[in-house]
Curated annotation (Swiss-Prot):
Reported function: Has no effect when overexpressed in E.coli. When Cys-115 is mutated to Tyr and overexpressed it increases (fluoro)quinolone resistance in E.coli up to 16-fold for ciprofloxacin, levofloxacin and nalidixic acid.
Entry keyword set: Antibiotic resistance
Keyword Transferase attached: no
Family according to the record: Belongs to the pentapeptide repeat protein family.
Source taxon at top rank: Bacteria
Taxonomic classification: Bacteria, Pseudomonadati, Pseudomonadota, Gammaproteobacteria, Vibrionales
Keyword DNA damage part of the UniProt annotation: no
Name the record gives this protein: Pentapeptide repeat protein VPA0095
One GO process term, biological-process aspect: response to antibiotic
Effect noted on mutating residue 115 to Y: Increased resistance to (fluoro)quinolone antibiotics when expressed in E.coli
Length: 216
């Protein structure tokens, strides 16, 4: 199913089956996709919020397994409780979106799980990722400034060329992450575990300057 150049306003798509559907250059304003089946669905150049609006679309408890959003406006969207395993978000504006309770993990047992997500080149400023598991995922070239990452674990993920706010360091797990080409201002190595983290040579100076050390 291919849909192009359509506008939907206040439509209730709850519990609808959009599996494998493709939407291109479509606009969705104040629409609900709660509990919808969006597995393997593709959204390209779509908008999910009107200009200057304060409320986006809702994907709460939707099945977004392996769904793909490319160059989409998803600001203020709600993804609470959604199945986001394998979700792909490329070059999207997600400012203020809420992912609290979203699931990016496949649990093999109570203690074993693996995550899958491809979130790259996105505006994630002021998003809510509180306590979200995003381990060993592609998360590079994103803007995370002001996002709520409290209790989240991004362990082992590629965070290269991302942007963070100084106050965010220490609120989430970055062990074994790729932090190359990331500004590390505000990161205190005394309280943030950098076990297995990758950085560039020039980043050493940022980490050690607060201690009065000069890197030659």
């Amino acid at each position: 199913m291919l849909k192009t150049d359509l506008i939907f306003e206040r439509e209730n798509f709850s519990h609808h089956d959009f599996q494998n559907a493709t939407f291109k250059n479509c606009h969705f304003y104040m629409c609900s996709f709660d509990h919808a089946d969006l597995r393997d669905a593709k959204f390209i150049d779509c908008r999910f919020i009107e200009s200057k609006a304060l409320e986006g679309c809702s994907f709460r408890f939707a099945n977004l397994k392996d769904a793909s959003f490319t160059n989409c406006m998803l600001a203020m969207s709600l993804f609470n409780g959604a199945n986001c395993m394998g979700l792909e978000l490329r070059k999207c504006d997600l400012k203020g979106a809420n992912f609290q309770g979203a699931n990016f993990a496949n649990r093999v047992s109570n203690t074993m799980f693996f995550c899958s997500a491809f979130i790259t080149g996105c505006n994630l400023t002021y998003c809510n990722f509180e306590r979200v598991l995003l381990e060993k995922c592609d998360l590079f070239e994103n803007r995370w400034n002001g996002a709520n990452l409290a209790g989240a674990t991004l362990k082992g993920s590629d965070l290269s060329r991302c942007e963070f706010s100084p106050e965010q360091w220490g609120t989430f797990n970055v062990e074994q992450c790729d932090l190359t080409h990331v500004e590390l201002d505000g990161l205190d190595i005394r309280r943030v575990s950098l076990f297995g983290v990758k950085i560039c040579d020039w980043q050493q100076e940022q980490l050690l300057a607060p201690f009065g050390l000069i890197i030659l």
